[in-house]
Every structure is written in structure tokens, then in C-alpha cells.
Amino acid sequence: MVCVLVLAAAAGAVAVFLILRIWVVLRSMDVTPRESLSILVVAGSGGHTTEILRLLGSLSNAYSPRHYVIADTDEMSANKINSFELDRADRDPSNMYTKYYIHRIPRSREVQQSWPSTVFTTLHSMWLSFPLIHRVKPDLVLCNGPGTCVPICVSALLLGILGIKKVIIVYVESICRVETLSMSGKILFHLSDYFIVQWPALKEKYPKSVYLGRIV
């Protein structure tokens, strides 16, 4: 009986420690000012990549190096990213010396894939996402809704929970989402440090979100 009580007390202490650890990480926003910030951008097929690149176009060279994460079968996004970086360098010669990298992970969900089966594909994607996040150790993760961003953001959160590095997660909901959040948005609303919406109707439904008007 005593052993059971001791084990229960130990388990309770561990649980309390983990809860406090998560709370501290989620609430901690202390970022040391630096000349540059490493940014990891999650790009998705179709309009997601177009929107996120428009947003990146307004950011300064201080966000460097830039790490892009795309699905392993998404060649269209890879081409758009390469074109964006080349155009950026042509417009401003100083951009020629900033570095960017493209990383690939498996898709969390293929087109027309059943939702129950996405549990396994997402876990597989997350299994490969954490080593990537651990290697890159970005200061900031920026995403706007592709399914690939879920395992990336969860991995970034785990990096902080484990005490390795606090990563700021910024989620920008797609301009196409006027009254309802995307599935990725519903998941990451509670995990991101800044959750940005582009329509006032979403701001009313989700008061904790940030509304800056249309930004892409």
C-alpha cells in the first residue's frame, strides 16, 4: 500500500512538473534581440505558397537564413520558392548574400485522403519533422494553413517544452477563410504564439486572434 502511495505521489509530482514546464514555455515570450532571425516557412500547394510568399516579400533581410518546408511531392511550391528568391536577389543585390534552404517532409494528408487515415500519415510526418526542427532550430515558424504545418508547429513547440529552444510560432489564416477557420487553424489556434486572421468576422469569433486587415 505504501509503495502504491509513493508511486502515485511520484507520478503526481512528474505531472505537475510537466504542466508547469509547458505553461512556462507557452507563456514565455522573451526573445533576445539580434541582427538576424532564422525563419522557417511552411509552404503548401496551390494558393498557400502564393500567399506566404507575398507575406515574405514584405519582410526585411533581417529574417535570414530562410528555411522553407514543403511536402515531398510538391514540385510546384519548390519552383515558386526558387523564383521568389531569384527575383528578390535581382531587385536588391544585398539579398544575394542571404541564404535559403528547401526541406521536404511527407504530406500529412493527400488530396481526397480519408480523415481517419490522416492520423497515421500525420504521425509519420511528425516523426520526420522533429529531427528537422531540432537541426535547424529556427527563431520563428511562419505558416498559413497547409496540413504540413501541423507536425512542424507541434515539433517546434516540443523543442521549447524540452528546454532546447523557444520557437515563436506565427500562424496567418488564409485570406480565403472569411467566417470559419481551416482544419489546421482550428488545431493551431491554441498552440501558436500569434494567430492572425484577415477578416473581422473571424476576429469576432476568436477574440484572442490578431486582426490586421488583409495582409496578403
Curated annotation (Swiss-Prot):
Main location: endoplasmic reticulum
Topological domain spans for side Lumenal: 1-3
The keyword Transferase is annotated on this UniProt entry: no
Pfam families the record matches: Alg14
Disulfide bonds: none
Listed InterPro entries: Oligosacch_biosynth_Alg14
Keyword line: Congenital myasthenic syndrome, Disease variant, Endoplasmic reticulum, Epilepsy, Intellectual disability, Membrane, Neurodegeneration, Transmembrane, Transmembrane helix
Mutagenesis or variant effect for R109Q: In MEPCA; uncertain significance; decreased function in dolichol-linked oligosaccharide biosynthetic process
Gene3D superfamilies found in the cross-reference section: Glycogen Phosphorylase B
Record keyword Transmembrane present: yes
An annotated GO cellular component: endoplasmic reticulum membrane
Residues in compartment: Cytoplasmic: 25-216
GO molecular function: protein-membrane adaptor activity
Residues spanning the membrane: 4-24
GO biological process: dolichol-linked oligosaccharide biosynthetic process; protein N-linked glycosylation
Cited function: Part of the UDP-N-acetylglucosamine transferase complex that operates in the biosynthetic pathway of dolichol-linked oligosaccharides, the glycan precursors employed in protein asparagine (N)-glycosylation. The assembly of dolichol-linked oligosaccharides begins on the cytosolic side of the endoplasmic reticulum membrane and finishes in its lumen. The sequential addition of sugars to dolichol pyrophosphate produces dolichol-linked oligosaccharides containing fourteen sugars, including two GlcNAcs, nine mannoses and three glucoses.
Recorded disease: Myasthenic syndrome, congenital, 15: A form of congenital myasthenic syndrome, a group of disorders characterized by failure of neuromuscular transmission, including pre-synaptic, synaptic, and post-synaptic disorders that are not of autoimmune origin. Clinical features are easy fatigability and muscle weakness.
Similarity-based family: Belongs to the ALG14 family.
Subunit architecture: Forms with ALG13 the active heterodimeric UDP-N-acetylglucosamine transferase complex.
Protein name, per record: UDP-N-acetylglucosamine transferase subunit ALG14
